[in-house]
Amino acid sequence: MAHTSSSTAPSRATTATYAAFISAGFLTATWAGRIPQLKEALQLDSGTWGLVLLAMAAGSVSALPTAGIIIDKLGAKWAVRIFSSLSGLALVGIGFGYLIGPAPVVISLYLMGFGLGVWDVAINVHGARVERAMKRTIMARFHAGYSVGTVAAALTAAVLIAVGFPIWAHLAIVGLGVAALVFYSVRNFLPEEAPSSSTPKVETDTLLDPADAQVVPKKTFFQVWSEPRTLAVGLFVLVFAFAEGTAIDWIGLGLIEGHDAKAAYGTLGLAAFLATMTLTRWFGNGLLDRYGRVAVLRALAFTALVGVLVFVFAPTPELAFVGAAIWGVGASLGFPVGMSAGGDDPANAAMRVSVIASIGYVAFLGGPPLIGMLAEHSSVLQAMLVVAAVTPIGFFLASFLRAPKRDVTSLIEGGADGQSDAK
């Protein structure tokens, strides 16, 4: 009986992790799907709205640098429970706050951003732990679960907008529902790994081949912040997070204001981006196993560039819709593979994932407000060209995500990823 419980624990933990990722995506896209209506209801111009979005960025950025410490203290399970509840209640606050004015929305966005910041790091740390327990790469599929949540939320928002469902009721129902669902589902998370500062761990942070890594003890929070490879991976994630975050917050407005599309069509454009991102994340493991992290991520950086350019310069809303779909493919794997790279060494996974996420979220949440400020002096579509300008940086940084080749750190089923990247 004990054997059965032990063997099924990783499977149950996998399901619980999917639930946490899906819920995070559903909550985030519920907010994003209502952005055009909230902006209109508050009667704000693009520049001022960009400043409102900055509140969410500030919340996440202030949470992420210490998220690893919080998770070490509380454990992933309780970190997810507490901060998903905070995020859900903050969404309720947005739903009622916009009826009063911008100030309650700004406060609620800050709290939602803070909650999402810790929640995101915690589920990625636990996802890396599940990968080690399952002995195969599944992080991209966890992030596909996040995208499933975003697609479902975007489609739900499109339907509710079309039928005139109240914003406050929509956000309140989702906020409370997500908080309750996550609190219950994470009961099946894996037990916390006992820390051991005296046992040497395999160090994979190196600018050379990961096979040349040395055996060193577990690192401190500040030591991890000084690692060249970790910082390079963080910068890589920043580039892809900027592409993803800009799309989520501005594709709808880009279609409506830039391509003169109807409100529901703008939300469907966001759904197209999220749908292709989801499919690529779900099936991307096969590409990573066959061709390796570096080759796949470089190809996706180029794809994202093409998608942005098609979206911006499309002569019709229909072609812009296609550009949004291509953009979703290109932006799909950068963030999840970056999280996997941070968890390559289990000894320092929590701290490294926290650092990488901290760097990435500067763009993921701070980039969209920047687009708003630029749009105030030009247009939404012209401002989006900044994404096209920075995406090539990800192409050159992809080499830092090369997977370790040794068994002690490899999570790739059959070792294909390490073999491919070694070429």
Model segments located where?
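C-terminal ends and interior cores of transmembrane alpha-helices
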Residues: 85-99, 303-315
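Intracellular juxtamembrane helix-capping segments at the cytosolic ends
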Residues: 117-133, 332-347
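Primarily marks hydrophobic transmembrane alpha-helices of the MFS/SLC 12-helix fold
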Residues: 77-81, 297
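C-terminal transmembrane helical hairpin of 12-TM major facilitator-type secondary transporters
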Residues: 291-338
